[in-house]
């Protein structure tokens, strides 16, 4: 399997003398299997450079699958400048997770309206098939592609590609589900020591991968001011990848403010962190233009997580029960959820919440912990004791952002734990992720 980075920057392109080594173009990665199957991850501004290269040196006609992690601008802004799209006879399949409000062609055509661009999407000469991709494993030629929702304020997917006996993951954009990563009373660096179920699931997705390309936009010092923006720190990524048994790790989606000297320092700190954990993982910051071929090196592959084909595209029409005594919170959550097509019912106390579970059969529950009378822990305990409540997805929404509250919530059966405050897009993404994984 062949890999090349065409864009490594996050948020906005950052050309200039201070970004020559690591690159200034936004996200775009090319992977080619031994049999010639070509996959392109994301179409940031790096896609323009890739397109020019393929026009000069690529096969004629050209065929490729484009896997978009999500449709934020820095991941699609190179799409109209990808020259092979204009060539009749070329064939492309463009895949992305289904959004809540618009179809993939609508999103891509939005940036190509005449107000912004001289050519519309319908004028492209190549044959283009658009496909909403769901969580699960998909066969694409001689490769297997597995998709999994990431923790991001928009619906974003990470991808695991298995081909030529090797595995590669592309994970942009993703934020830790919880900080710190580890249980305080357990040994760091082990899968079972991960505190939040979401982070453990993320680690399982990476389990024993040969190559992982992961968003690592921030330093630990920068992260508190950027929390809920949907990006990781190099320390989180290095630790979780090492715990997952990853062999090769590329840190990418570099912050626009991080010049070459800064990224060199981040690379060194990440390598020192991996070494301090006793890990053999090889860590690098992704460099635009870097290319290498790799193959599977023998180590245990038996623990790779199995991802079931569960369609999350219909998660925009769930019946969601909000149980919270804070009316302002209920209003905020109701507006956010109804905007994406959910049906919302509400209770301001635990007793009423349990009654509504019986009478309205919700698909998912948002549950506060601190309520008068019956607190959220007791609601969870009673809910899980009922036949119809054992597998019901429950997201705990609480101002208690401490480890003990998170740990106790999971012990009582919570599916996810989200500390207040949160953004509406973040809530929608977590609802989709929670619903998708509740039955796995």
Model features per residue range: what roles?
Residues 1-183, 203, 259-304:
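Binuclear metal-dependent hydrolase catalytic cores
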Residues 177-281:
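Cap/insert and terminal regions of metallo-dependent hydrolase folds
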Residues 348-352, 375-381, 388:
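Acidic catalytic/metal-coordinating carboxylates
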Residues 360-366:
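Active-site beta3 strand of CheY-like receiver
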Residues 378, 401-418:
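Alpha4 helix (beta4-alpha4-beta5 surface) of REC/receiver domains from two-component response regulators
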Residues 404, 422-431:
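C-terminal output helix
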């Amino acid at each position: 399997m062949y890999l090349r980075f065409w864009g490594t920057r996050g948020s906005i392109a950052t050309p200039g003398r201070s970004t020559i080594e690591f690159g200034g173009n936004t996200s775009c990665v090319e992977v080619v299997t031994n049999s010639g199957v070509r996959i392109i991850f994301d179409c940031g501004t790096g896609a323009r450079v890739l397109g020019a290269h393929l026009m000069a040196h690529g096969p004629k006609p050209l065929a490729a699958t484009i896997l978009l992690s999500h449709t934020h601008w820095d991941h699609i802004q190179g799409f109209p400048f990808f020259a092979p799209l204009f060539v009749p006879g070329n064939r492309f399949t463009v895949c992305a997770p289904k959004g809540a409000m618009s179809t993939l062609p609508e999103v891509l055509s939005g940036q190509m309206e005449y107000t912004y661009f001289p050519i519309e999407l319908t004028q492209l000469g190549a044959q283009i098939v658009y496909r909403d991709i769901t969580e699960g494993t998909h066969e694409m030629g001689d490769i297997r592609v597995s998709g999994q929702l990431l923790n991001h304020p928009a619906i974003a997917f990470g991808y695991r590609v298995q081909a030529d006996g090797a595995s590669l993951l592309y994970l942009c954009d993703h934020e830790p589900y919880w900080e710190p990563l580890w249980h305080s009373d357990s040994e760091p660096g082990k899968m079972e020591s991960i505190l939040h179920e979401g982070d453990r699931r993320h680690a399982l997705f990476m389990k024993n991968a040969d190559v992982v390309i992961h968003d690592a936009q921030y330093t630990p010092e920068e992260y508190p001011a950027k929390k809920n923006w949907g990006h990781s720190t190099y320390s989180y990524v290095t630790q979780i990848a090492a715990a997952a048994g990853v062999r090769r790790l590329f840190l990418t989606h570099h912050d626009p403010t991080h010049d070459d000297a800064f990224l060199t320092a981040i690379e060194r700190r990440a390598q020192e962190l991996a070494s301090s954990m006793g890990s053999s993982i090889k860590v690098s910051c992704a460099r635009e233009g870097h290319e290498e071929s790799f193959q599977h090196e023998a180590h245990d592959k038996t623990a790779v997580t199995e991802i079931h084909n569960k369609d999350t595209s219909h998660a925009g029409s769930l019946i969601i029960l909000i149980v919270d005594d804070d009316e302002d919170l209920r209003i905020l959550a109701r507006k956010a959820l109804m905007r994406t097509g959910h049906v919302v019912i509400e209770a301001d106390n635990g007793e009423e919440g349990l009654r509504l579970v019986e009478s309205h059969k919700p698909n998912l529950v948002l549950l506060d912990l601190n309520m008068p009378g019956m607190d959220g822990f007791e609601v969870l305990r009673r809910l899980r004791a009922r036949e119809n409540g054992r597998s019901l997805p429950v997201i705990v929404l609480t101002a208690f952002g401490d480890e003990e509250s998170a740990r106790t919530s999971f012990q009582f059966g919570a599916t996810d734990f989200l500390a207040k405050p949160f953004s509406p897009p973040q809530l929608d993404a977590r609802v989709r992720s929670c619903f998708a994984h509740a039955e796995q």
